[in-house]
Regions:
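Nucleotide-activated chemistry modules centered on ATP-dependent adenylation/adenylyltransferase
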Residues: 1-33, 38-279
Length: 279
């Protein structure tokens, strides 16, 4: 059963950000994770609205670069990391990422290997991340190393995207009266444990794009190509080594053929497996 509020999702999201900054700013590290996608774009700019209200000048923004990122995604991330109110953390450290497909591992930024693209000049490349791990555990390791065990990270998950996210973000309180997150709590000494919050958990895809277009917010231009191939809800920007990226690979071949060749040569067996399963 659905219960509707008198507030719209935009007003509700702003209230959530106000709560986050009011309760935790200056008391624990607050960060925003971005992927280059539409949801993290909205998160970033909603945060800026509330930062302006509260007189907050900058916020740490983390991009955990998985190497096999589309050129247009990287172009957009460079724009984000140069915004005057962003404190940039662009991580390009080695780890082996698992993609749940029978031994398909990818040596992200593998030492001595020929990468899909060169690293950024000021990126963070010396973090020690457990090599064989899921992405969620890898980014947790990154956040712990950069911001400490009491970090509060803000992300862009939404319940519309999957039943699993619906269950995760509507059950189990992480703060009093708040279920739209994970982890949380305190240690025996009263200090904070790590916490991740998702303030746009109840937004629909149309809400996301309405906010972006209404406010004329720059976004990753890869979406413009995806709009011509897929329904709006199916347009996603993510690392190209994920299994679902098979739907995007033909488009990457068309718009960035040089990068596509480097990507396939980088991990040719991975993409052979993906293409075979897609057929």
């Amino acid at each position: 059963m659905k219960f509707y509020s008198e507030k719209n999702v935009y007003e509700a999201a702003l209230e959530r950000f106000r709560y986050i900054f009011r309760e935790f700013y200056g008391k624990r590290p607050i960060t925003i994770s971005v992927s280059g996608g539409k949801d993290s774009t909205v998160i970033l700019h909603l945060a800026k609205e509330v930062m302006d209200e509260m007189g907050i000048d900058k916020i740490p923004v983390l991009f955990f670069d998985q190497e096999a990122e589309a050129p247009m995604t990287i172009e957009y991330i460079r724009y984000v990391m140069n915004l005057p109110w962003v404190e940039p953390y662009w991580v390009q450290s080695f780890f082996r990422e698992w993609n749940a497909s029978k031994g398909d591992w990818f040596n992200v930024w593998g030492p001595g290997e020929k990468w899909c693209r060169e690293k950024e000049k000021d990126s963070i490349g010396d973090l020690v991340i457990k090599k064989n791990t899921f992405f969620s555990k890898a980014i947790d390791s990154v956040l712990l190393q950069l911001f400490g065990k009491d970090y509060l990270n803000i992300g862009g998950l939404r319940i519309e995207e999957s039943p699993a996210r619906l269950s995760t973000l509507t059950h189990n309180e992480v703060l009093p009266g708040i279920t739209w997150g994970k982890f949380g709590g305190t240690y025996k000494d009263g200090s904070y444990k790590k916490l991740v919050l998702y303030p746009i958990w109840d937004w629909k895809t149309n809400d996301v794009w309405y906010y972006i277009f209404k406010n004329k917010i720059p976004y990753c231009k890869l979406y413009n190509y995806l709009f011509t191939k897929k329904p709006l809800q199916g347009c996603r920007v993510s690392s190209l080594i994920h299994e679902e990226s098979i739907q995007v690979l033909p488009l990457i071949k068309e718009i960035s053929p040089g990068f596509y060749d480097r990507l396939v040569n980088r991990h040719i067996q991975k993409f052979r497996n993906l293409l075979f399963r897609n057929k």
